[in-house]
């Protein structure tokens, strides 16, 4: 499984170890546990081959449903890696994604993409299609986003891991890559965000020609806002939750 993951740029996403005695037991106990696990997927209720909802994305929707409930049940804020569909839909409509006409040439970017739910909803509101770009700091959440894209058949989505403010992954030469549309739900009031970005930002997010100033070090909201502005094309549109 690890080799398959690496071949598809999903290294570190699949961490299941079916030889782990501490989790599965030993000998007959392990065999029984694995047999029960396989039996779950043999349940006839999971056979969707005769389902008449041919156009529904059952697997993808089920995956998002599980992520939403995991966030709630685990006590983590859903905003950490999941944006509710209703909020995502409003953001997509606000920036006019329904008017995008250039197909895959249209670019949509989320600088703090989490599990990718906001990007996928933006794509749903773009009838002509688009190319998705996302960056996420947490490596495990990047895995969730990549799986989410695959399950929703967005195989061309470009999801990368890294600190968006201090290590932006989408660049053109020595400048930030710019996009047609940006949607974002960055972490609220991030503390100690100022690292390699420093006071003289090499991407001129804190001002070029007109000095804007460095955002407060103990509150990263403004830093994400300036990153979004700098990552927009001159004719671009953006919506964010701050």
Q: What is the meaning of each model-derived region?
A:
Residues 77-184, 189-200, 209, 242:
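Conserved S-adenosyl-L-methionine
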Residues 91, 214-242:
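Conserved Class I SAM-dependent methyltransferase catalytic core
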């Amino acid at each position: 499984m690890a080799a398959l993951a690496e071949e598809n740029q999903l290294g570190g996403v699949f961490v299941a170890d079916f030889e782990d005695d501490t989790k599965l037991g030993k000998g007959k106990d392990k065999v029984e546990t694995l047999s029960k696990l396989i039996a779950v997927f043999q349940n006839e209720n999971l056979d969707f081959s005769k389902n008449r909802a041919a156009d529904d994305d059952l697997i993808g929707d089920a995956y998002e449903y599980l992520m939403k409930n995991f966030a709630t049940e685990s006590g983590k804020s859903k905003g950490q890696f999941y944006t509710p569909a209703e909020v995502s839909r409003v953001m997509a409509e606000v920036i006019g994604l329904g008017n995008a006409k250039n197909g895959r040439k249209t670019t949509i970017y989320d600088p703090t993409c989490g599990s990718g739910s906001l990007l996928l909803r933006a794509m749903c509101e773009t009838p002509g299609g688009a190319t998705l770009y996302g960056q996420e700091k947490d490596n495990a959440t990047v895995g969730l986003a990549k799986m989410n894209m695959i399950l929703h058949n967005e195989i061309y989505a470009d999801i990368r891991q890294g600190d968006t403010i201090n290590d932006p992954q989408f660049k053109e030469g020595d400048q930030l890559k710019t996009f047609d549309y940006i949607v974002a739900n960055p972490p609220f009031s991030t503390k100690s965000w100022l690292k390699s970005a420093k006071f003289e930002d090499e991407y001129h997010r804190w001002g070029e020609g007109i000095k804007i100033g460095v955002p407060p070090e103990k509150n990263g909201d403004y830093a994400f806002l300036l990153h979004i502005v700098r990552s927009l094309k001159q004719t671009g549109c953006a919506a964010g939750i701050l």
